[in-house]
Amino acid sequence: NHFGRTPPCTESLLWAGVSRVVIGSMDPNPTVRGGGVDALIQGGVDVDVGLLEGECEEQMSHFMHWCKNRRPLVTMKASTDSEGRVDGPPSQPSSRFSSDRSLELSHEIRAESMAILVGIGTVLRDDPSLTVRGPDIGPRGTPIRVVVDPSNRIPGECKLMMDTEAPTLLIQSSEYDSSHDPPHVERVVIAEEEIPVSRILDM
């Protein structure tokens, strides 16, 4: 029962003469929570709340987290060896500890995310694409690729700068020349030498 970009759906339900409404989970947004139910009951509609509530809240977990914390839900993905290392020695080529199944799961996580964030070290070491790949992923959107690069070390010929499949956002400590950046690349300045993740999440 909230006026936002669209009018309240409660008015449409009452106007249509709907006699019964089943709600799996209450709206997690505290500014509107409960108002729609009250309006429907006052309009003579039979309202049931809580059917498959756990399943509904799981589907809305990202949105519910944002409503509560006003920050995006963060999922960390890491592959390590038996000693807890995520890569081999810097003097050797980049190592991959992931199995085929873990790679599939990684792309499933990417497909459910709005952005993928890495540090400049990952870009320099691996030259990743940070796109969603896999035959079973389905037609989902490609997340924004975010690189924390305070000192503008990103190579102009790396995949994130050359590949236009998804937008690339560079988080930097100062303004740098962006006149040669392709259209899919955007730069944002957070004026701190060591950029805290909290500042990025608050953007």
Per-segment meaning from a language model:
Residues 34, 39-42, 61, 68, ...:
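Short, surface-exposed, charged/polar-biased interaction segments
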Residues 1-56, 193-195:
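Zn2+-dependent cytidine deaminase-like catalytic core
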